[in-house]
Amino acid sequence: VISDVQFNKIQGLIQKGIDEGATLVAGGIGLPDHLDKGYFVKVTVFANANNSMTIAREEIFGPVITLIGYDTEEEAINIANDTDYGLAGYVSSGDMDHAKDVANQIRAGQVIVNYVGGNSDTPFGGYKQSGNGREKGVWGLHDYLEIKAITGF
């Protein structure tokens, strides 16, 4: 990661996940085993988490994933939307119409369906506390424009 501040923030969140009872599947605190300096974070996976845990509620911005189980699609959508943030989401389905329906219910600036990421033409940006500006594509150009309305002719 970019700095000791971000490294320490991520390390604190990983520790918080452990302290709050999530199952540490991979990774954890500290540098990767083959490194003794730098701001490298171990790829970390938590399972058996719930949406009340800090690691599920914060944008970690590091190689940390929190897995939360669900029983119904409605519950999954509620979990996805029960956050102060909304940068991105992911939907996987063999039925594209159904996937689009689910994606439309997720309050995030970008929802990826059956794909590894967006492309350079799609706008990227968040909802809620993840921000509301857009980068990339035609929407990204709006930040560089000054709009003028002329009325009364």
Task: Pin down the residues of each PLM region.
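Cytochrome P450 fold signature focused on the C-terminal beta-domain
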Residues: T23-D33
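Short beta-strand to alpha-helix junction loop
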Residues: V1-Q11
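Conserved C-terminal structural/oligomerization subdomain of aldehyde/semialdehyde dehydrogenase
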Residues: I14, E20, D33, K37-F153
